[in-house]
Each structure stands twice: as C-alpha cells, then as structure tokens.
UniProtKB/Swiss-Prot annotation:
This is Large ribosomal subunit protein uL23. GO terms for cellular component: ribonucleoprotein complex; ribosome. Transmembrane segments: none annotated. One of the early assembly proteins it binds 23S rRNA. One of the proteins that surrounds the polypeptide exit tunnel on the outside of the ribosome. Forms the main docking site for trigger factor binding to the ribosome. Pfam families: Ribosomal_L23.
Length: 98
C-alpha cells in the first residue's frame, strides 16, 4: 500500500475541532492501515510534523433505507493523531478552526 493512499480525508466534526486545541488531528484512513503505517503516512504527507501517538477507531456500518430497500454504509477507520510538542501544526485544519 502506498503511503499517500493511507489517508483518505480529514474528519471535520465538533468533537474533532475541540480535540485540535489539544494537538490531536482526526483523519479517515484506509481500513487495512495499521498504526505504524498511519504514522509514516502523516509524517510523509506533512512537512515538519512529528507524530507522538496514533489511536485508531473502527467505525461500524450504519443501516440506511432508500424507500423500502435497506442497505448499509461502508465501514471506515478513523485515526486520531497526537503530535509532539516541538512539531509544526498541520495547515489543513487551520481554515476550519477559525
């Protein structure tokens, strides 16, 4: 798996915006990615960023209905990235935080 295929998109929710103040960034990642691969992908994608820890959450699929047909959304994986104290901030979240 290529490092640039690991991170899919940032998660922009109220809870993730509050976690930004503590230096924690939330991304949706590939379901096959493990913590070491996620750490390497974040450090490769953003210059000057050093990852202190990675926490992952498997998000279960939700049941959805379209008319009388029921189906499920896709399962996803979220990664909560904590940066070191001497690390640069990720600029991707700068516009959303303001």
């Amino acid at each position: 798996m290529n490092l640039y295929d690991v991170i899919k998109k940032p998660v922009i929710t109220e809870k993730s915006m509050i976690a930004l103040e503590a230096g924690k960034y939330t991304f949706e990642v590939d379901t096959r990615a493990h913590k070491l691969l996620i750490k390497q992908a974040v450090e490769a994608a953003f210059d000057g960023v050093k990852v202190a820890s990675v926490n992952t959450v498997n998000v279960k699929p939700k049941a959805k209905r379209v008319g009388r047909y029921t189906g499920f959304t896709s399962k996803t994986k979220k990664a909560i990235i904590t940066l070191t104290a001497d690390s640069k901030a990720i600029e991707l979240f700068a516009a959303e935080a303001e």
